[in-house]
Amino acid sequence: YRKSVDAFNKKYDGKYFADIEFIPRNDSGGGYSDKINASVMSGDLPDVLTVDGPNIAAYAENGIIQPLAKLTDEEKSVYLDSIIQQGTYNNKLYALGAMESSVGLYYNKDILAEAGVEVPDADHPWTWSEFTEVLKKVQPVVEKKKGYALDMTFPTGEATIYYYAPFFWSNGGDFVSKDGLKVNGVFNSKENLETVNYFKSFLDNGYMSKVQITDLFESGRAAFKFDGAWEVNTIYNNYPDVNLGVAPYVVSDNWDGGRYTPTGSWAFAASSKTK
């Protein structure tokens, strides 16, 4: 972004000047969110700010950001439909994400080859039962490395729901009612309990560690890891010895054939004070 800002300032020298400030954000949203909230209260918001996807509607409803009314259809056409949908509130576009995100089931090709495991294609993902059998096959291979079949963590903040939402959805579960107003009977549904118990089976069978082990997959001591799309770049740049593959997410034995993945991204928006 610094390069883009420098190019902008060079192009519009003497007419406009842009500056950029990077503010760290922790897993619970603190730091950056605290700074923005304080700026809202003081009326000192910057002209352009980044907004996390789930917060766009609230920012728009409260008049913190303004519609991007001057964008043409041609300009909007270069963005994914999911990005346009994320940034739209009450039929008005308020924010645009520079990227999209999703999750993947990452695997170590060398470990799976040694265990004699073949990876299915996107149209025929492993079911829960099938994946359990796969974990059973790879466990002896990773035990020789003092590792686990699965590098699966449940971090605080938003990451846990983001990573594992497809498990719940493929089993017919959800987190809130369709109108967004109810949790009881939805979050604690029979389907969601089945999903949580499936996670528990990984611990019960010793396929994952009971405590988080840093870089377990990246160090070649785990066969699988569920993570975001950003993990690919991290592994390629920092762990080049990992023979990385990406498999479709595991689906429930009761899978209805639907495709489920979380999406969403930080987006750019213009504050309401911007002219």
What are these model-predicted stretches?
Residues 110-123:
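Aromatic-glycine-rich donor-binding/catalytic loop that engages nucleotide-sugar donors
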Residues 51-104, 113, 129-134, 143-146, ...:
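Hinge/lid segment of periplasmic solute-binding proteins
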